[in-house]
Amino acid sequence: MHELAIIISTWVIPFERIHYLIIIILAVSILLSDRSPNAMLSWIFTIFTFPLGGAILYLLFGINWRKNKIISKRMKGEEKKLFSRLFNFMQRDVSDIFRSRDFFYYNRLKNIDGNADKMSESEIKKKIQGQIDTMITNIGLPAQQREIVKMLYRAEGTFLTNNDSYKLFYGGKEAFDSILEDIGNAKNTIYMEYFIWRSDELGERIKNALIKKAKEGVKIKLLFDGVGTWKLPKKYKRELRNAGIEIRWFLDVKFFISKMNYRNHRKIALIDNKIVHTGGMNVGQEYIDGGKRFESWRDTNIRITGEIIGQYLAIFVTDWLNSGGKYSFGEDVKGEAVHELEEQKPIDKQEKLEYLMQVSSSGPDTEWTTLKYLYSKMIATAKNEVLIQSPYFVPDTDLVSQLKMAALSGVKIKIMITGVPDKKMPYWIAETYFAELIEAGIEIFRYKAGFLHSKNIIVDEKISTMGTCNFDMRSFEINYEVNSVFYSVEISKDLKTQFLKDLEVCERFDEARLKKVTFRKRLRNSVFKLISPIM
């Protein structure tokens, strides 16, 4: 018996030492990571409370990829030459910032300053940014809008674009009828990128429409998220491929298990590089009728024609190439579409300005959490009113403080979240913020007529944004997201009108309702809030 104890201790003691060493190494890694103090504390709490499970969770979901690039554009030769004027997303080398209007300004800079070719990258960027700032000022935008335009340009390189038309959709039937109509009218290319794509009734309709166009010679590329479409049947995929349709998976979990937490949440449909559909809607029948779980589904999508197409095209091509897709865009878009994008000149206040827009996108490996900055800046610049719609509401302390400061400054703020959740945990965590927000004068509403999936913010009826980004830390820090930003009173009023209609089927969460939340529920919600920074 004594010998057995010696043998066990011989194995157990070294194992314990290794175990504690791993925990210490992970704790140091967390402390040295570029993340918020709350996230650091949450991860350290998790690995010390649940050593084995916590360590596995951290290795799978906790590594901060903002400094360790998950993806990088794989372009060379003719690929880079053709798209050099489309790309400026997620990188800062000077060869890639000279696209479209940046390229225009660089050429003008060379004409003005003969030493431009000898300037350093930082000097060139500074010169170009100065010219861009002057252009934005000369357009005559109000300071409130101008600040956001400049921030997005400096953070992402996305330009202000002048667009011809838009149409907002507040229900899935109308949105997908429009997408299917545009697919039916496609002549050259169809590019679609979605987080969820099901083989249900809607999925079959879109599949059949795509196969029909592929047989007509239209070149089609489909980009699916590796997790959001993992249930897609082999037969469904085989039918698409047999028709000549190219399919790729973004961070397929079969090959990127350590990155399975980082998902492509974008929803983009590009038709002939002239039309883009984007917003909150995935390809699934529930987005039309609510499915089996919900009475109905409230969401927002938009159809746009105009200059903004170039920015969505750049995002799609980037994601496609980084998902192992072969480069074949030269034949697809060479000619009129790319030529028009290359020839774009800076917006001039003398020209007719229709619908001014910008794209904002970010992901776990982008230099800045730009979408979080966008939401924060919109709240900070508000003078009168902020309207927020999001199914999930899990902000960090910075955004909570921003909201409270705006409310205490006299800005009227209404926040609308879903009252019929699809996920319990974010719903519970959201409740933990209500007391301090209500105390600051912010109104909280829960949408009760089905599931609310819209992600919209409207400020002062002048600036608005909608897209894929929820008001939560997963969207800000972990997922790949994309939003359209509108500097248009017409579009902002359109979104506000729908917000007010949605209010009619909401219940207000006020102080009286707060008092009815039991101690048990408050404790449960607060426990889950502890780990919210790592969700």
Regions found by a protein language model. Name each.
Residues 392-413, 418, 423:
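Helical hairpin unit composed of two closely spaced alpha helices linked by a short loop
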Residues 50-53, 390, 394:
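Hydrophobic alpha-helix-in-membranes signature
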Residues 1-372, 377, 381, 421, ...:
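N-terminal localization/anchoring segments of enzymes in phospholipid and broader phosphate metabolism
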Residues 411-415, 419-471:
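C-terminal structural cap/anchor segments
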Residues 374-378, 401-404, 408-409, 429:
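Exposed, interaction-prone extracellular/peripheral surfaces
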